[in-house]
Protein backbone atom coordinates (compact mmCIF):
# COMPACT_ATOMS: atom_id res chain seq x y z
CA UNK A 1 0.00 0.00 0.00
CA UNK A 2 2.81 2.41 0.89
CA UNK A 3 4.59 1.67 -2.39
CA UNK A 4 1.35 2.31 -4.28
CA UNK A 5 1.00 5.65 -2.48
CA UNK A 6 4.54 6.63 -3.46
CA UNK A 7 3.90 5.59 -7.07
CA UNK A 8 0.66 7.59 -7.21
CA UNK A 9 2.30 10.67 -5.71
CA UNK A 10 5.09 10.33 -8.28
CA UNK A 11 2.51 10.67 -11.06
CA UNK A 12 0.93 13.71 -9.40
CA UNK A 13 4.17 15.59 -8.88
CA UNK A 14 5.25 14.99 -12.47
CA UNK A 15 1.98 16.60 -13.51
CA UNK A 16 2.73 19.58 -11.26
CA UNK A 17 6.24 19.74 -12.72
CA UNK A 18 4.69 19.96 -16.20
CA UNK A 19 3.08 23.22 -15.08
CA UNK A 20 6.52 24.81 -15.52
CA UNK A 21 6.06 24.45 -19.28
CA UNK A 22 2.67 26.12 -18.97
CA UNK A 23 4.04 29.07 -17.01
CA UNK A 24 6.90 29.47 -19.51
CA UNK A 25 4.65 29.47 -22.56
CA UNK A 26 2.06 31.73 -20.92
CA UNK A 27 4.68 34.34 -20.06
CA UNK A 28 6.58 34.06 -23.34
CA UNK A 29 3.36 34.49 -25.28
CA UNK A 30 2.25 37.63 -23.48
CA UNK A 31 5.53 39.57 -23.31
CA UNK A 32 6.94 41.53 -26.24
CA UNK A 33 8.91 39.54 -28.80
CA UNK A 34 12.26 41.03 -27.79
CA UNK A 35 11.87 39.59 -24.27
CA UNK A 36 10.80 36.02 -25.07
CA UNK A 37 14.31 34.51 -24.86
CA UNK A 38 14.87 36.13 -21.47
CA UNK A 39 11.53 34.81 -20.20
CA UNK A 40 12.38 31.24 -21.22
CA UNK A 41 15.83 31.52 -19.63
CA UNK A 42 14.32 32.99 -16.47
CA UNK A 43 11.83 30.15 -16.08
CA UNK A 44 14.48 27.47 -16.54
CA UNK A 45 16.76 29.29 -14.11
CA UNK A 46 14.11 29.75 -11.42
CA UNK A 47 13.34 26.03 -11.46
CA UNK A 48 17.01 25.19 -10.98
CA UNK A 49 17.38 27.74 -8.18
CA UNK A 50 14.20 26.59 -6.44
CA UNK A 51 15.38 22.97 -6.48
CA UNK A 52 18.84 23.89 -5.16
CA UNK A 53 17.62 26.17 -2.37
CA UNK A 54 14.94 23.75 -1.22
CA UNK A 55 17.54 20.98 -1.14
CA UNK A 56 20.05 23.21 0.65
CA UNK A 57 17.78 24.37 3.46
CA UNK A 58 14.11 24.70 2.49
CA UNK A 59 12.94 21.16 3.20
CA UNK A 60 14.54 20.99 6.63
CA UNK A 61 13.10 24.39 7.57
CA UNK A 62 9.61 23.44 6.43
CA UNK A 63 9.69 20.03 8.14
CA UNK A 64 12.02 20.44 11.13
CA UNK A 65 10.29 17.85 13.30
CA UNK A 66 10.38 20.37 16.15
CA UNK A 67 8.70 23.55 17.45
CA UNK A 68 5.20 22.24 16.78
CA UNK A 69 2.63 25.02 16.93
CA UNK A 70 5.35 27.63 16.51
CA UNK A 71 5.82 30.53 14.12
CA UNK A 72 9.55 30.47 13.36
CA UNK A 73 10.99 27.00 12.71
CA UNK A 74 14.56 26.06 13.62
CA UNK A 75 16.92 26.56 10.69
CA UNK A 76 18.83 23.56 9.35
CA UNK A 77 20.77 22.96 6.18
CA UNK A 78 20.73 20.02 3.82
CA UNK A 79 18.13 17.36 3.22
CA UNK A 80 20.93 14.90 3.88
CA UNK A 81 21.07 15.96 7.52
CA UNK A 82 18.01 13.78 8.09
CA UNK A 83 20.30 10.77 7.76
CA UNK A 84 20.39 8.23 4.95
CA UNK A 85 17.94 5.92 6.71
CA UNK A 86 15.30 8.66 6.70
CA UNK A 87 15.27 8.90 2.92
CA UNK A 88 13.05 5.82 2.84
CA UNK A 89 9.47 5.07 3.78
CA UNK A 90 7.74 7.19 6.36
CA UNK A 91 4.93 5.04 7.71
CA UNK A 92 3.19 8.06 9.24
CA UNK A 93 2.86 9.67 5.81
CA UNK A 94 2.44 6.50 3.75
CA UNK A 95 5.26 7.39 1.35
CA UNK A 96 8.99 8.05 1.36
CA UNK A 97 10.46 11.29 2.69
CA UNK A 98 12.44 11.55 -0.55
CA UNK A 99 9.16 11.36 -2.48
CA UNK A 100 7.75 14.12 -0.29
CA UNK A 101 10.82 16.24 -1.03
CA UNK A 102 10.19 15.93 -4.78
CA UNK A 103 6.51 16.74 -4.28
CA UNK A 104 7.32 19.87 -2.30
CA UNK A 105 10.11 21.06 -4.58
CA UNK A 106 7.75 21.23 -7.57
CA UNK A 107 5.35 23.23 -5.39
CA UNK A 108 7.99 25.76 -4.37
CA UNK A 109 8.94 26.17 -8.03
CA UNK A 110 5.26 26.78 -8.81
CA UNK A 111 5.08 29.53 -6.18
CA UNK A 112 8.17 31.22 -7.62
CA UNK A 113 6.74 30.89 -11.15
CA UNK A 114 3.72 32.92 -10.05
CA UNK A 115 6.09 35.72 -9.06
CA UNK A 116 7.91 35.38 -12.38
CA UNK A 117 4.75 36.18 -14.31
CA UNK A 118 4.04 39.27 -12.23
CA UNK A 119 7.49 40.79 -12.77
CA UNK A 120 7.84 39.84 -16.46
CA UNK A 121 9.48 42.73 -18.36
CA UNK A 122 9.78 44.66 -15.09
CA UNK A 123 12.77 43.14 -13.34
CA UNK A 124 16.42 42.46 -14.11
CA UNK A 125 17.03 38.76 -14.62
CA UNK A 126 19.80 38.43 -12.04
CA UNK A 127 17.80 40.39 -9.48
CA UNK A 128 14.91 38.00 -10.06
CA UNK A 129 17.18 35.00 -9.56
CA UNK A 130 18.23 36.47 -6.19
CA UNK A 131 14.56 36.95 -5.29
CA UNK A 132 13.81 33.37 -6.37
CA UNK A 133 16.55 32.08 -4.06
CA UNK A 134 15.16 34.10 -1.13
CA UNK A 135 11.60 32.89 -1.70
CA UNK A 136 12.68 29.26 -2.11
CA UNK A 137 15.03 29.20 0.85
CA UNK A 138 13.30 31.51 3.34
CA UNK A 139 9.77 32.73 2.59
CA UNK A 140 8.17 29.57 1.23
CA UNK A 141 9.65 27.14 3.81
CA UNK A 142 8.72 29.32 6.80
CA UNK A 143 5.11 29.89 5.76
CA UNK A 144 4.90 26.25 4.65
CA UNK A 145 5.96 25.21 8.15
CA UNK A 146 3.02 27.12 9.60
CA UNK A 147 0.59 24.59 8.14
CA UNK A 148 2.17 21.54 6.51
CA UNK A 149 5.12 21.50 8.92
CA UNK A 150 2.95 21.45 12.07
CA UNK A 151 3.27 25.15 12.83
CA UNK A 152 0.76 27.48 14.46
CA UNK A 153 -1.82 27.34 11.63
CA UNK A 154 -1.88 23.57 11.79
CA UNK A 155 -2.28 23.74 15.56
CA UNK A 156 -5.20 26.15 15.07
CA UNK A 157 -6.97 23.61 12.87
CA UNK A 158 -6.28 25.20 9.49
CA UNK A 159 -6.29 22.68 6.64
CA UNK A 160 -4.80 23.28 3.18
CA UNK A 161 -4.98 19.98 1.34
CA UNK A 162 -3.91 21.04 -2.16
CA UNK A 163 -1.88 24.19 -1.52
CA UNK A 164 -4.35 26.98 -2.27
CA UNK A 165 -2.84 28.98 0.59
CA UNK A 166 0.58 27.44 1.12
CA UNK A 167 1.52 27.52 -2.57
CA UNK A 168 -0.73 29.81 -4.57
CA UNK A 169 -1.55 32.48 -2.00
CA UNK A 170 2.08 32.62 -0.91
CA UNK A 171 3.23 33.04 -4.51
CA UNK A 172 0.51 35.61 -5.20
CA UNK A 173 1.42 37.65 -2.11
CA UNK A 174 5.08 37.76 -3.15
CA UNK A 175 4.03 38.63 -6.71
CA UNK A 176 1.78 41.48 -5.57
CA UNK A 177 4.46 42.91 -3.30
CA UNK A 178 7.05 42.76 -6.09
CA UNK A 179 4.71 44.34 -8.65
CA UNK A 180 3.81 47.21 -6.31
CA UNK A 181 7.44 47.81 -5.38
CA UNK A 182 8.78 47.72 -8.96
CA UNK A 183 5.95 49.52 -10.71
CA UNK A 184 4.63 49.17 -14.27
CA UNK A 185 6.50 47.84 -17.28
CA UNK A 186 8.76 50.24 -19.16
CA UNK A 187 6.75 51.96 -21.87
CA UNK A 188 3.34 51.21 -20.41
CA UNK A 189 2.67 54.82 -19.39
CA UNK A 190 5.53 56.65 -21.11
CA UNK A 191 3.27 59.25 -22.78
CA UNK A 192 1.00 59.84 -19.82
CA UNK A 193 -1.55 57.50 -21.36
CA UNK A 194 -2.03 53.75 -21.27
CA UNK A 195 0.02 52.26 -24.11
CA UNK A 196 -0.86 48.89 -25.59
CA UNK A 197 1.95 46.35 -25.27
CA UNK A 198 1.20 43.51 -27.64
CA UNK A 199 2.13 39.94 -26.77
CA UNK A 200 4.62 38.04 -28.90
CA UNK A 201 2.51 34.95 -29.54
CA UNK A 202 -1.07 34.61 -28.32
CA UNK A 203 -1.50 30.95 -29.46
CA UNK A 204 1.54 29.99 -27.35
CA UNK A 205 0.04 31.86 -24.40
CA UNK A 206 -3.24 29.99 -24.93
CA UNK A 207 -1.40 26.66 -24.99
CA UNK A 208 0.34 27.58 -21.74
CA UNK A 209 -3.04 28.43 -20.22
CA UNK A 210 -4.46 25.02 -21.09
CA UNK A 211 -1.39 23.22 -19.72
CA UNK A 212 -1.88 25.04 -16.42
CA UNK A 213 -5.59 24.30 -16.51
Set out the residue ranges of the language-model regions.
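Short, well-ordered junction/capping motifs at the entry into regular secondary structure
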Residues: 1-2
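Hydrophobic alpha-helical transmembrane bundles of multi-pass membrane proteins
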Residues: 5-213
Amino acid sequence: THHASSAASDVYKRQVMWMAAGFTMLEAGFVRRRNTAEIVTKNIGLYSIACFMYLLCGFMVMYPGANEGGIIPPYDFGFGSKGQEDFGMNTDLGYADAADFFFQVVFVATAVSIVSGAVAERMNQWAFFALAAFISGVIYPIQGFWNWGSGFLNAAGYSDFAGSGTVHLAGAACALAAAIFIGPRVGKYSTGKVNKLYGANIPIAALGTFILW
